[in-house]
């Protein structure tokens, strides 16, 4: 199951709304989207049904009724469980220094931060991170192409590379979820999805005002993939999003 599901890329709409020039239009049209008819159907279901009637109300409740220290702490626990996955993937990339940032974050926040409820590790500048590292990004770092765009019901946007990465990441964590119980995995991903959506509530209208929300979201998704594969170093283009925006997309 995806760590953060529908509309976690909403903030990207800020830089993508409006009319594109000829060069931009050409680049957009060259995206690998051979399943566009199917994808648009799934997009409408996710956006008009799942988000509108499930995620958005849950996100509003998360913001309005859950005290900030509690919501941040619960999200911290969920995110802390991704650190071992990032540690392994960084080692596969031959990046031991970055790998041990995740390793140290995990044990420090687990032992001293009540399982990640408090992010003690980020008190050290050297242990602060912007994104976790999935196996999909690891494949991308070795030059594996993302592949065709796919929109699945509830799961939302993905590609063959990212789906493969999600399966491998899940395999890393399988023994843990077997130990604590599978339903807790759903709780983890649910908390991350609602927390991510809650952070983007104020930007929903920007996506609705886009000339083609489907294209807007698709471009944001591909830019986000490139951003994460390159560790926050994005090749500049007329459609590129600011770094501070991309850091909030996961």
From Swiss-Prot:
Pfam families: MlaA
Entry annotated with the keyword Membrane: yes
Annotated localization: Cell outer membrane
One Gene Ontology term from the biological process aspect of the record: intermembrane phospholipid transfer
Lipid tethering residues (S-diacylglycerol cysteine): 19
Endpoints of the signal sequence: 1-18
Lipid-bearing positions (N-palmitoyl cysteine): 19
Cellular component, GO annotation: cell outer membrane
Membrane topology listed for this record: Lipid-anchor
InterPro entries on file: MlaA
Coiled-coil residue windows: none
Record keywords: Cell outer membrane, Lipoprotein, Membrane, Palmitate, Signal
Transmembrane segments: none
Organism superkingdom: Bacteria
Physiological role: Involved in a phospholipid transport pathway that maintains lipid asymmetry in the outer membrane by retrograde trafficking of phospholipids from the outer membrane to the inner membrane.
Protein family per UniProt: Belongs to the MlaA family.
Name the UniProt record assigns to this protein: Intermembrane phospholipid transport system lipoprotein MlaA
Organismal lineage: Bacteria, Pseudomonadati, Pseudomonadota, Gammaproteobacteria, Pasteurellales
